[in-house]
Every structure is written in structure tokens, then in C-alpha cells.
């Protein structure tokens, strides 16, 4: 192989490595940018009569009374969803669900959190995932998720971003928080 061809190969190699590292760096820095609520507009606010609770899921059949009562509330998320919840036993356990006021359908995702005593700083920590701030004018839903670390010595905090489409929540991004 001639020296000129080798030089060209080396130049291409450095160019490729430099380009791929820039792409990698862009993905890493861009990955922590949270989605914005204004990028996920909701349909117009539903102002009609609440639908009858749809009993097409085990969740709806199990919590029929609580979910039916929730349909009388004003929507708080994505133009037509009401947020409701209930205690689920000991340790400050709490479940949250969203119900579509227009269709009466329950989103099948249950958000669940409970209190956990942290012996390191003698405080109660909420562990699990819960809805942080539903927005009536956006289909973007933000949740906080707290888990025990793999070594069990501290907690790991995340912010999860979901969008609702056709009565289904889809996780679109998870960002690990530094707490």
C-alpha cells in the first residue's frame, strides 16, 4: 500500500472517530434535556357530562366506587382526565390513577408510593412512583420515581415523562436526578 493511500485511510479514521465522538457527546448531553409541556398540547378541555365508568378492566371493576366518584371531579390532565387515589395499607402507601372523564376509561397504569424510613438521615422518604404535576393543557405527564439503590445504602431519584395517546400512557423519557 502506498504512503498516500495510508495517509488517506488515517485521515478518514481520525475524521470518523472525531465525528462519532461528537455524535456520542451530543446524545449524552441532549439526553438530560427534559421534554416540555408546550411541545405536547392537549385536546380542548372537556366540559361535557361525565361518562359512565367503563368496567372493561380489572382495575375499574375492583375500584368501581372510588373511580365512579372521581368522574364528578374537574379534569386536571390532558384536557379530560381526572386524578384520583386511595390508601393501600400500611407505611403510608398510596395509589394514584387517571380516569378519562369523556370516555369513562381508566388508564391501566397505577402509580404507587409508600413511606420508607431512612436510617442515614432519620427521615421519611417516599419510595415508588407518583404523579408530580398533571397539566390540564398538555398530554405530557411528569412523575417522580424513587428507588432503593442496588447496594441498599441510599435512594435513587428519577423524573419520568409520559404522554397519553388513545387512552394509553407511554414512557418517553427518564432522567436520573441528582438528589
PLM-predicted stretches and their roles:
Residues 46-61, 98-110, 160-174:
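Surface-exposed loop/turn elements that mediate protein-protein interactions on large endomembrane-trafficking
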Residues 35, 102, 106-115, 151-156, ...:
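Cysteine-rich, disulfide-bonded extracellular modules and peptides in secreted proteins
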Residues 73-112:
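Mid-length scaffold segments of soluble, non-membrane domains
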Residues 110-164:
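Short aromatic loop motif centered on NTY/YTY
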Residues 25-74:
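Terminal domain-start segments
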Amino acid at each position: 500500500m502506498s504512503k498516500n493511500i495510508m495517509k488517506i485511510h488515517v485521515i478518514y479514521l481520525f475524521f470518523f472517530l472525531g465525528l462519532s465522538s461528537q455524535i456520542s457527546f451530543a446524545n449524552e448531553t441532549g439526553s438530560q434535556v427534559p421534554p416540555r409541556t408546550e411541545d405536547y398540547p392537549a385536546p380542548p378541555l372537556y366540559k361535557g357530562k361525565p361518562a359512565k365508568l367503563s368496567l372493561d378492566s380489572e382495575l375499574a371493576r375492583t375500584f368501581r366506587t372510588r373511580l365512579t366518584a372521581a368522574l364528578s371531579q374537574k379534569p386536571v390532565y390532558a384536557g379530560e382526565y381526572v386524578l384520583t387515589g386511595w390508601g393501600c395499607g400500611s407505611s403510608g402507601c398510596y395509589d394514584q390513577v387517571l380516569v378519562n372523564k369523556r370516555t369513562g376509561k381508566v388508564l391501566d397504569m397505577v402509580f404507587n408510593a409508600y413511606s420508607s424510613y431512612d436510617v442515614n438521615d432519620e427521615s421519611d422518604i417516599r419510595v415508588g412512583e407518583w404523579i408530580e404535576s398533571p397539566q390540564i393543557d398538555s398530554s405530557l405527564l411528569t412523575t417522580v420515581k424513587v428507588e432503593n439503590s442496588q447496594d441498599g445504602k441510599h435512594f435513587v431519584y428519577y423524573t419520568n415523562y409520559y404522554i397519553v395517546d388513545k387512552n394509553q400512557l407511554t414512557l418517553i423519557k427518564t432522567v436520573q436526578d441528582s438528589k
